């Protein structure tokens, strides 16, 4: 992992750690798989409460690109918001491509035991 990714990940944790509707933040994508380039984006899954997910869905924000806090050339956060129940179902019953998407994923922060 490049230093700019480490810094961006710390910024991402800071962004969500005090939000009680965020249960966990999980690193995915090329960085989690060890295939990153210096300009790779930071892919993250933000695990939220069902109520937060419904609001994000209603606002059409279950995925979003965020540039704030990811300040290297070409860098941004590619965020996907899911519930814990969705991720459990994906792990148990998801297609191979869905399960592969989470392979090597790494929990960055959790408040869920």
Please annotate each region the language model reported.
Residues 1-23, 31-39, 45-100:
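Metal-dependent nucleotidyltransferase catalytic core
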Residues 27:
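Ligand-binding pocket scaffold of soluble enzyme catalytic domains
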Residues 99-113:
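Catalytic cores of NTP-dependent nucleotidyl/adenyl transfer enzymes across multiple folds
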């Amino acid at each position: 992992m490049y230093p700019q990714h480490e810094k961006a990940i710390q910024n991402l944790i800071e962004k969500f750690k005090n939000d009680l509707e965020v249960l966990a933040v999980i690193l995915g994508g090329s960085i989690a798989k060890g295939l990153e380039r210096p300009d790779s984006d930071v892919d993250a899954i933000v695990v939220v409460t069902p109520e937060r997910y419904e609001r994000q869905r209603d606002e059409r924000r279950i995925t979003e690109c965020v540039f704030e806090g990811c300040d290297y050339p070409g860098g941004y956060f590619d965020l996907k918001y899911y519930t814990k129940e969705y991720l459990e179902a994906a792990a148990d019953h998801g297609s191979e491509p869905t399960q592969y998407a989470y392979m090597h994923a790494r929990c960055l922060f959790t408040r869920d035991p």
